[in-house]
Amino acid sequence: DYASYMNGLSRKLTARNCELFYMSVNPCNTAMKSTRKESEIRGFNNRLRQRLNGNFTCINSYSYLMRCGYTSRCEFRGYTDDGVHYSMRTYKRIYAYAIKQIR
């Protein structure tokens, strides 16, 4: 499974003094993408967080976006909302949050 693979990889990378981070799966607009469910995303994120060893730092962008807001109306797709891709503003917000967590 995914967590086992990451845990195995972490042992090799921490032996080389690497700092390890993982970012949660982000929310989607289920009104536009009904095949994806928020409960499944939350479940995956929770299982991964519980199963990963202590070598990882979690960047919980899912909770950040749920708290601060996001939009999946994408400029690159003619301002359409496919439920999966974000606006440029949201992508920049995710990037800034991740950099802040890493530093």
Language-model features: where?
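Glycine-rich anion/phosphate-binding loops
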Residues: D1-M6
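Surface-exposed amphipathic alpha-helices with a cationic face
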Residues: N7-T14
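A short helix->loop->beta-strand "cap" motif at the edges of active sites that frequently abuts
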Residues: A15-L20
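Catalytic His-Asp segment of secreted/periplasmic serine-dependent ester chemistry enzymes
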Residues: N26-R103
